[in-house]
Design a protein with these regions (language model features):
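Solvent-exposed interaction patches of small proteins and small membrane subunits
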Residues: 1-144
């Protein structure tokens, strides 16, 4: 692994840990989750860290590839699509996770559990993101 990829690798590992913690909750009914504040905390925190990992990885790739500086977290993910690191349609689908992360961090008094559940059901997109990032890293290593 190249030294400049170490931060990306660590975040990919953290993202993977979060996804493993979240997967068991995908099959639970929303009412069951809403009855248990511990379940809610586990889900919220791991979705927040997963989203932050996606954003941090995007920003590191942007820095390493000297891509356009993003105005915000949402745009950071879109830039990866514009650069061909992610398929553009996938980047557009994934970018709203940045806003969801902001809700979890800043609007924690008004958590919309429909939105939380929607993000929980789509954590497979984060696995797809991880695969695209790993592919990009392999391509970078093979061209050096």
């Amino acid at each position: 692994m190249k030294l400049e990829f170490s931060g990306i690798e660590r975040r990919l590992e953290k993202l993977d840990v979060c996804l493993k913690k979240l997967k068991p909750f995908r099959s639970m009914q929303k009412d069951e989750i809403l009855k248990d504040p511990y379940f809610q905390d586990i889900i919220e925190r791991n979705l927040q860290v997963a989203a932050q990992s996606v954003i941090d990885i995007a920003n590191r790739i942007i820095s390493l590839d000297a891509l356009k500086k993003p105005r915000d977290y949402y745009e950071a993910i879109l830039i990866l699509g514009q650069a061909g690191i992610l398929p553009l349609d996938f980047a557009q689908k994934l970018a709203p996770i940045a806003g969801f992360r902001n809700i979890l961090v800043h609007d924690y008094l008004e958590i919309d559990w429909e939105e939380v559940n929607s993000n929980l059901q789509h954590i497979g997109d984060l696995e797809t993101y991880m695969q695209h990032v790993k592919n990009w890293m392999r391509e970078q290593e093979s061209t050096q």
